[in-house]
Swiss-Prot record:
HAMAP family cross-referenced by the UniProt entry: Ribosomal_uS19
PROSITE patterns named in the record: RIBOSOMAL_S19 (PS00323)
GO cellular component: cytoplasm; small ribosomal subunit
Record-given protein name: Small ribosomal subunit protein uS19
Underlying gene: rpsS
Region (Disordered), start-end ranges: 77-98
Amino acid sequence: MPRSLKKGPFIDFKLEKRILDLNAKDEKKVVKTWSRSSMISPDFVGHTIAVHNGKTHVPVYVSDNMVGHKLGEFAPTRTFRGHAGGKAEKGGSAPRKK
């Protein structure tokens, strides 16, 4: 169920303040955050935000298409190592009929 419109989007106060301070100074620094649930606002565009994935901080460069999404969507928390079982042989199947 989506968040109520009357509440507005959630953006971590400290994160928003740091981004607005950088915008006022025209600086581009990497900003570390643990707030994966913060919504990306138009003020964040052009900045690199290091989002914590549970182990490390993953640098995420914010572009125009990311506005409205959450920071955690761009920092995966799980590593896919492949399915169990032996490796499939290359070209081991029967030839296809046309």
